């Protein structure tokens, strides 16, 4: 096995849409190894758990739900030998480790066990052998935050666990961005190493991949070229698993915004730092229903961003402009957005790639990616009797994990029931 690592990092950017700004994050990763899965290289002897230690409930839970059914270790007591000694890392707290363990089981393991053709056997064959959790992020030399590392399809390290907030599914610090996009992405690599993706996928975006410069690229400009994320534009293998992971974890609003943005042509120009700083506070000036909300999304005419190199850029849709740079309106006061000027409709390219992922999962693993997406998001968001996602009064999807049913307000939430599974093992504890 080689030592190639797959590093997930967050590079921060500030974006401005008209008069509003928002904080966005793009996933940054380095190359993955193509190691084959083989026999266990770890000590597989069983050791009895110490019932007198404080961590006995979680130790028992992960043994019963990770190790025994799937030969998967969930290591939350941070191991220096398994961590990057060049970084000042902090262990995950016991409480946050409990939260992540029950969520990984509920939102990842249980989903694949339910939908894969071989059920539980599928995960025992193909899941990573180790999930290692760390409380803090690691910081890279370019200032980005490392939130995950994957090694050879065997070990996945999830960082920043002490920031876990079950009440936040979306966003830069949401469950999906920090943890579950990583899990689906890396699992996609393992499956791709087992049964290679269709060769037709590798030719769709030939000539557009940039292994060295992808990190400085704008999300929307890359979307217009047919990539779901800038990292997906680094190489075909990453494009493949990013397409899979984004489709599964993006809710309907975010996926629709991505496709809408991808349909248009975009341009990026340098922007003065002083203008950038002057516009930044305006994100917080719109109030809806008494709540402070940022209104920016990718489906707008333009936004500001700060690159990983601390350069300031204006990213905007291509429209006719006058000599002063203002949008040129026609006689009726309208303007026309440019599409397919480069003969690429990013929306159609993304959907073409998704169709190949869909067929590959179905043919090789008997997994319907649309059912997978519905199952994952149906566990994250409240649905009505017809399976439609429910929105709150602000138009946001309702978090199912923390939802309190008005008809049964005294009943525990789903997340409370999940953590109670761990608490049940306290009954088996002893004291010295």
Model-derived features: positions:
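Acidic/polar, low-complexity intrinsically disordered N-terminal segments immediately downstream
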Residues: 4-6, 32-117, 121-124, 339-432
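Second-shell loop/turn segments in exported
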Residues: 86-94, 163-174, 178, 226-234, ...
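Active-site recognition of the HExxH zinc-binding catalytic motif
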Residues: 170-198, 241
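Metalloprotease/metallohydrolase-associated module, dominated by Zn2+-dependent proteases
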Residues: 209-432
């Amino acid at each position: 096995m080689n030592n190639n690592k797959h590093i997930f990092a967050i590079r921060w950017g500030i974006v401005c849409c008209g008069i509003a700004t928002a904080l966005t994050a793009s996933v940054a990763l380095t190359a993955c190894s193509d190691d084959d899965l083989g026999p266990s290289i770890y000590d597989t002897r069983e050791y009895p758990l110490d019932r007198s230690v404080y961590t006995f409930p979680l130790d028992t839970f992960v043994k019963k739900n990770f190790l025994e059914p799937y030969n998967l270790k969930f290591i939350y007591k941070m191991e220096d030998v398994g961590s990057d000694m060049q970084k000042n890392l902090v262990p995950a707290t016991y409480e946050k480790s409990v939260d992540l363990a029950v969520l990984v089981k509920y939102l990842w393991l249980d989903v694949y066990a339910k939908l894969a053709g071989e059920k539980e056997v599928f995960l025992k064959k193909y899941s990573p052998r180790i999930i290692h959790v760390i409380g803090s992020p690691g910081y890279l030399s370019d200032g980005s935050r490392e939130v995950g590392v994957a090694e050879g399809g065997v070990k996945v390290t999830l960082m920043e666990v002490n920031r876990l907030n079950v009440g936040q599914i979306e966003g830069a610090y949401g469950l999906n961005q920090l943890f579950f996009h990583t899990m689906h992405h890396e699992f996609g690599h393992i499956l791709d190493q087992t049964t290679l993706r269709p060769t037709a996928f590798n030719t769709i975006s030939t000539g557009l991949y940039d292994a060295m410069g992808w990190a400085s690229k704008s999300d929307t400009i890359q979307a217009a070229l047919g990539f779901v994320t800038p990292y997906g534009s680094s190489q075909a293998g990453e494009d493949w698993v990013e397409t899979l992971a984004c489709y599964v974890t993006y809710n309907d609003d975010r996926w629709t915004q991505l496709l809408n943005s991808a349909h248009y042509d975009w341009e990026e120009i340098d922007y003065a730092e002083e203008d950038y700083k002057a516009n930044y506070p305006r994100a917080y000036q719109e109030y809806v229903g008494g709540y402070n909300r940022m209104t920016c999304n990718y489906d707008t005419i333009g936004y500001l961003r700060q690159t990983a190199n601390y350069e300031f850029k204006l990213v905007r849709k291509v429209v006719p402009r006058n000599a002063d740079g203002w949008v040129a309106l026609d006689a009726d006061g309208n303007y026309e957005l440019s599409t397919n000027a480069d003969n690429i409709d990013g929306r159609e390219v993304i959907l073409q790639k998704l169709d190949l992922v869909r067929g590959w999962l179905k043919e090789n693993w008997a997994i319907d990616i649309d059912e997978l997406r519905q199952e994952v998001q149906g566990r994250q968001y409240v649905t009505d009797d017809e399976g439609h996602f429910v929105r709150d009064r602000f138009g946001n999807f309702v978090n199912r994990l923390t939802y309190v049913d008005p008809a049964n307000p005294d009943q525990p939430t789903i997340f409370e029931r999940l953590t109670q599974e761990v608490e049940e093992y306290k009954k088996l504890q002893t004291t010295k």
